[in-house]
């Protein structure tokens, strides 16, 4: 009967030394830290083991409610980790040293009459009474305003107001003024950078359009390749410096730059002529001599004192002058038309056609718009490289 005690069952949830309500803690005999070996296989039935009476006490532990590890858990060997909850009352520091460190209390603000005496001596009532003074009203309402009369303010009133202004100072700049002062130049800089990047793409786009005319229906390939300087297949608009077609690419882009400059100058000339800033004397039929200087004896008085001459004087052989007024706008265009009409007489036959075209019915204009819509995509492919020039023309039109 005094034989060996029966061996308990193995497995999860069979630890008899501690309450294990959750059932997922292994037996102690599986852990070598508790001394399980061949001589002492059953640690739970060892008569000389510590029964750990603290394990039966349910308290706050490290592994959840209902279980307290007797030998300390992952939180250490402190009383709180062992399941013993101890509360140590916090002793406040002495009153003498309570405010020696840290932020000091904010003192009570002094009365307004002590901290800002100028605000007490210059209140709203006194301010309005001063404004009712005719001498002060004359300072704010000059002659012709709502004031009954304009009187120079007395020196004492002016000095008093200036002293108040010097004490108060200028108003602080608001965030709105600061923001508007910064946003304007930034927007101009951003728009200028965008236009610059778009303008730099104009020569390459025109170069691609120019070279595509030589390869209708085919992919453009550089024609400068040969056996002496072999290069890989590339577009004629991006030739490397070692390619014989590089010099032709530079020549094309130089011509394109000159063409763009010519377009800008033509637009500027048209704009100045439209605003009447080109006082060009028109050609007088049957006469080839014109003079913009003032005439002494004219059939029409000449106005030679203005910035631009308002009439042109012709001096025929009889000594009398004939003055013809300069058009207020499109003077240069009319001069070119008259000059071309004298050189090419057939241009005068186009005048009735132009007048008829201007007086067309809306149906004809709708037909023209429909044709432009039909040919629009192809025209867009042709005119798309010139689209970045439109903002430049618009700026010239607005600011000149």
Curated annotation (Swiss-Prot):
Protein name as catalogued: Large envelope protein
Pre-S: annotated segments: 2-174
The organism's place on the tree of life at top rank: Viruses
Domain observations: The large envelope protein is synthesized with the pre-S region at the cytosolic side of the endoplasmic reticulum and, hence will be within the virion after budding. Therefore the pre-S region is not N-glycosylated. Later a post-translational translocation of N-terminal pre-S and TM1 domains occur in about 50% of proteins at the virion surface. These molecules change their topology by an unknown mechanism, resulting in exposure of pre-S region at virion surface.
Virion surface topological domain: 2-181, 275-348, 399-400
Entry keywords, A to Z: Acetylation, Caveolin-mediated endocytosis of virus by host, Fusion of virus membrane with host endosomal membrane, Fusion of virus membrane with host membrane, Glycoprotein, Host-virus interaction, Lipoprotein, Membrane, Myristate, Transmembrane, Transmembrane helix, Viral attachment to host cell, Viral envelope protein, Viral penetration into host cytoplasm, Virion, Virus endocytosis by host, Virus entry into host cell
Annotated TM spans: 182-202, 254-274, 349-369, 376-398
GO terms under biological process: caveolin-mediated endocytosis of virus by host cell; fusion of virus membrane with host endosome membrane; virion attachment to host cell
Region (Pre-S2): 120-174
Subcellular location, record wording: Virion membrane
Family statement drawn from the similarity comment of this UniProt entry: Belongs to the orthohepadnavirus major surface antigen family.
Lipidation (N-myristoyl glycine): 2
Organism annotation: Hepatitis B virus genotype A3 (isolate Cameroon/CMR711/1994) (HBV-A)
